[in-house]
Amino acid sequence: MATINDNYLKLKAGYLFPEIGRRVSAFAEANPDAPIIKLGIGDVTEPLPEACRSAMVTAVEDMGNRDSFKGYGPEQGYGWLREKIAAHDFQARGCDVDAGEIFISDGSKCDCGNILDIFGDNNTIAVTDPVYPVYVDTNVMAGHTGPCNDQGEYEGLTYLPINAGNNFTAQIPSQKVDLIYLCFPNNPTGAVASKSHLQDWVNYAKSHGSIILFDAAYEAFITDPEIPHSIYEIEGARDCAIEFRSFSKNAGFTGTRCALTVVPKTLMAKAADESDVELWKLWNRRQSTKFNGVSYIVQRGAEAVYSEAGQAQTKALISFYLENAKIIREKLTAAGLQVFGGVNAPYVWVQTPNGISSWDFFDQLLHKTNVVGTPGSGFGAAGEGYFRISAFNSRANVEEAMRRITANL
């Protein structure tokens, strides 16, 4: 009989968001008339920018004409999109990133997991706690961890607690770790990192030969000019960091699927024989073998983000969600809850009232207010006693959800 990858059996009972979906579905089935408002999973609600829609319609027409039809595209992405990304998102901020170092993909979630294909099995790995579950679960699937303990922590991972006491920015570890996952603006806490904090991480990584896996999926929500948008704004980062970005939240591409990963050509890691190997070459080989590229139509839509109209429309989208976050922050703070995040990020991180557990607060809100959020404990042991509320919804739903919650605390 064929055998399985036993590492999957080490995963906790259910990925966080499917478990939320299961509980919400059970509640909805028992209460079919309940007006449920979902502020849990970070999915957008507003339509794609008109500039993107128009570009995609034109691209569809291209596919209907023999002269402009496109078949397989470059696995790395079309040059016209990569050039615009390099110029606007990186070079305009003083980052030394070339278009040839950018790989277009169908999601940063995929890339965060797939990047492990080019790293060895013996690397030590550090994640913050709480943390986006994908970083942990993909390492479990790849066999990089031992079993899970009662607190949900996996043997073999180095957990770096982030909490109100350290302003939700992890302390540099005293021991050497090889791969370091950082996410700023942070999911789930909404925290941001100063330039000096990121410089400390880069200095650590360079001194230990470590690689930083930097998730910048929410960088477009940064409004503070002192906060870096990219790890490559930090001196030395090209020698120790890979960056992931996405069009999902800034341009509403959660259902359209387009993202990017930057792998500098100067970035090296060790082979078993102690020789230095360019990670760019490995990632390029991996993508060329396992990925056929993002749809031409979708890439044209992403390119339109960088047009004058696209920039104005995406800015309006971001401002809309940030205003939602402001409403959530202000209403819950006024109701007496301790609230974090939601300023340079679309997530608000709330301390649960009266010391109740994260899942108990989830059930309380669902049953009393018909509002869905995300239990902090689902992001790690240090998330217990916290709750994430997403700003991704309509203004009317956000205002109604806050009315219900504040009336039932």
Swiss-Prot record:
Keyword Repeat applies: no
GO biological process: lysine biosynthetic process via diaminopimelate, diaminopimelate-aminotransferase pathway
Pathway participation: Amino-acid biosynthesis; L-lysine biosynthesis via DAP pathway; LL-2,6-diaminopimelate from (S)-tetrahydrodipicolinate (aminotransferase route): step 1/1
Gene name per UniProt: dapL
Protein name in UniProt: LL-diaminopimelate aminotransferase
Sequence positions that bind pyridoxal 5'-phosphate: Y72, S108, K109, Y132, N187, Y218, S246, F247, S248, R257, N292
Subunit and interaction comment: Homodimer.
Residues binding substrate, per UniProt: Y15, G42, K109, Y132, N187, N292, R388
GO molecular function: L,L-diaminopimelate aminotransferase activity; pyridoxal phosphate binding
